[in-house]
């Protein structure tokens, strides 16, 4: 792989890490919020259950 490809993948990984509040293995949501994850993904964002279209966990 070229250096540019590695750099792009690293940036993509960092952005992905920064935008997810929680994952199904480390649910850091507080109160009544659940970890709302897109179907097939284990990372998601904390939100109220009724606001989560995929059902979360």
From Swiss-Prot:
MF annotations from Gene Ontology: toxin activity
Organism lineage string: Eukaryota, Metazoa, Spiralia, Lophotrochozoa, Mollusca
Tissues showing expression: Expressed by the venom duct.
Record comment regarding domains: The cysteine framework is VI/VII (C-C-CC-C-C). The presence of a 'disulfide through disulfide knot' structurally defines this protein as a knottin.
Transmembrane segment boundaries: none
Entry keyword Transport: no
Localization annotation: Secreted
Keywords: Disulfide bond, Knottin, Neurotoxin, Secreted, Signal, Toxin
Species annotation: Californiconus californicus (California cone)
Function: Probable neurotoxin.
Superkingdom: Eukaryota
Signal sequence, start to end: 1-18
Chief place of localization: secreted
Keyword Membrane in annotation: no
Disulfide bonding pattern of the chain: 22-36, 29-46, 35-52
Record-level GO cellular component terms: extracellular region
Protein name, UniProt field: Conotoxin Cal6.39
